[in-house]
């Protein structure tokens, strides 16, 4: 990260940092509670569901990819991925042209469960979504979070934000909605062999 001139009044720095901490904590508490309630019927926790989502989006992610995209420690990504593998939801595989890295992909059961979780999403029980609806009604669109994205870009780097944007775009393109039902459109992008 580039060194910046942080010569700002201490009081301003503390107030900003505290405001960001409290707002982030309040939002996360709501997101976490709603996310847990959403996936509880599928016997998943947040890390497991997030890994399934990343595995779907990246379609052949390494543990490092999952840790990076999921903003989690490598050991957390590995341990929860192994639990999902034991449930038959993920497979560990190698690319034919890259035997060094192990890639994690959704199994058919994993893809099916992931789709079921998407179908079960209920915007009426997701408080952050409900909190943003008045802004959508007023401005015609949901908040785009440009200031927040700028802050995250300075913390995690441009590549993180580019991957984040690409995954959201891919997800929007890969999920089809018809008559209130979701369908995942994409298939594996490269041939895999079981990990040894």
UniProtKB/Swiss-Prot annotation:
Pfam families to which the protein is assigned, alphabetical: MarR
Domain annotation HTH marR-type: ranges: 13-157
DNA-binding region residue numbers: 63-86
PROSITE patterns recorded: HTH_MARR_1, HTH_MARR_2
Record-level GO BP terms: negative regulation of DNA-templated transcription; response to stress; sporulation resulting in formation of a cellular spore
GO molecular function, one term: DNA binding
Domain of life from the UniProt record: Bacteria
Keywords annotated in UniProt: DNA-binding, Repressor, Sporulation, Transcription, Transcription regulation
Quaternary state and interactors: Homodimer.
Function: Negative regulator of protease production and sporulation.
PANTHER family xref list: DNA-BINDING TRANSCRIPTIONAL REPRESSOR SCOC, TRANSCRIPTIONAL REGULATOR, MARR FAMILY
HAMAP family in UniProt: HTH_type_Hpr
Protein name: HTH-type transcriptional regulator Hpr
Native source species: Shouchella clausii (strain KSM-K16) (Alkalihalobacillus clausii)
Taxonomic path: Bacteria, Bacillati, Bacillota, Bacilli, Bacillales
Encoding gene, per UniProt annotation: hpr
